[in-house]
């Protein structure tokens, strides 16, 4: 047990406000109504206690008593099991496996393109945003079939998709033409959820419970 973790009596999330993986975890914490301390991290000057807790020095890092977790997927699945209501993973193993595959594809296919849009040259940014916009419009029927991403209920897959769309919105992407109505309706649904508003600091937490 590290001394850094033993000092913390409240669940703590080391995060950075601009990091998409941290945003995922914040949505889950808000969905679950968990009381936690957010420790904002300057990625250019990592705090010593984070380095002591996480050998990779990455965010998000979650500290829950003696347990230290890093990697957003591991953190989110832990939170979903630790705080079962509301459930964010589907009941049946086949459905869960399909959701995990979707999350993997989003992380591998879309997130690197988003990183180019955020950190690349102007040419790379323009190309990346165009690619993401076209790919999302290309799957627009998926957004139309169900209230949430391939699901009747809000779940972990939405915690991958919603932060991506939020980033695109703030990068100036506007969805127009065929398929845009379904995507914009989805964005409206997820962006107005209490959990999402809390995750971006635009609403106060509600019905919080501590982690004991």
UniProtKB/Swiss-Prot annotation:
SUPFAM superfamilies: GST C-terminal domain-like (SSF47616), Thioredoxin-like (SSF52833). Gene3D superfamilies: 1.20.1050.10, Glutaredoxin. GO terms for cellular component: cytoplasm. Residues 92-212 form the GST C-terminal domain. Forms an equimolar complex with the RNA polymerase holoenzyme (RNAP) but not with the core enzyme. It comes from Haemophilus influenzae (strain ATCC 51907 / DSM 11121 / KW20 / Rd). Residues 9-87 form the GST N-terminal domain. NCBIfam families: PRK09481.1. The lineage of its organism: Bacteria, Pseudomonadati, Pseudomonadota, Gammaproteobacteria, Pasteurellales. This is Stringent starvation protein A homolog. InterPro entries: Glutathione-S-Trfase_C-like, Glutathione-S-Trfase_C_sf, Glutathione_S-Trfase, Glutathione_S-Trfase_N, GST_C, GST_Omega/HSP26, SspA_C, SspA_N. Belongs to the GST superfamily. HSP26 family. Pfam families: GST_C, GST_N. It comes from the Bacteria.
